[in-house]
């Protein structure tokens, strides 16, 4: 569904590609607000964490960082449909980097539209919890996001984003899996 700017670009891209005669296979999260898709059986169950309690957020920390269900469902989709290319819009904190090794396994080229600064700033914005310009994480010292409460001034959100950034730094750097950035 059209939640914000990135989702609008996602749907506009689908429309443009289909007008050019391409088959577009969406892969996303399940949500009651989603538009119907013939592929929704492959969509991933994942809660809206912004509306979740601290306990719920901790319960989902592992899938926030590495979502096994997303990897399994993407692999099933690839095996059925055999796509030529993958175009990623949003994956962090939901589908997660877990989808990248699956795409690489099947030698599917990956393009990513970059809608924010997430690749270099855990909180997406280059601002700290007080709204000041911030580059503290530029040398991959992501704990600053946590200590400065950069995500909506909340400790738990900032903690989760810091953990996710360290995980990507040490295990699944998107830079190593994505062929082109837009």
Language-model-derived ranges and their functions:
Residues 1, 68-70, 91-94:
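Short beta->alpha connector loops
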Residues 1-33, 79-81, 96-99, 103-109, ...:
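N-terminal subdomain of nucleotide-sugar transferases
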Residues 7, 35-41, 99, 122-127, ...:
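Short aromatic-enriched loop/helix-cap "lid" or pocket-rim segments at secondary-structure transitions
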Residues 19-85, 141-148:
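A conserved catalytic-core segment of Leloir-type glycosyltransferases
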Residues 75-95, 109-113:
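Short N-terminal targeting/anchoring amphipathic segment
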Residues 93-94, 114-124, 179:
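A short, histidine- and acid-enriched strand-loop-helix "catalytic/donor-clamping" loop
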Residues 105, 118, 133-181:
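Membrane-proximal helix-turn-helix segments that form the acceptor-binding/catalytic region
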């Amino acid at each position: 569904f059209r939640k914000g700017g990135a989702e609008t670009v996602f749907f506009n891209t689908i429309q443009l590609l289909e007008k050019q005669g391409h088959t577009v296979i969406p892969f996303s999260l399940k949500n009651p607000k989603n538009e119907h898709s013939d592929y929704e059986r492959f969509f991933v169950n994942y809660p809206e964490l912004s509306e979740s309690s601290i306990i719920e957020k901790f319960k989902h920390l592992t899938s926030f960082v590495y979502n096994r269900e997303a990897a399994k469902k993407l692999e099933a989709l690839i095996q059925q449909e055999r796509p030529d290319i993958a175009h990623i819009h949003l994956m962090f904190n939901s589908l997660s980097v877990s989808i990248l090794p699956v795409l690489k396994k099947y030698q599917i080229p990956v393009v990513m539209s970059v809608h924010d600064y997430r690749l270099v700033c855990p909180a997406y914005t280059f601002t700290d919890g007080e709204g000041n310009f911030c580059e503290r994480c530029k040398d991959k010292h992501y704990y600053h996001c946590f200590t400065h409460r950069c995500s909506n001034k909340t400790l738990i959100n900032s903690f989760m984003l810091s953990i996710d950034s360290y995980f990507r730094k040490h295990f699944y750097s998107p830079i190593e899996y994505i062929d082109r950035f837009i």
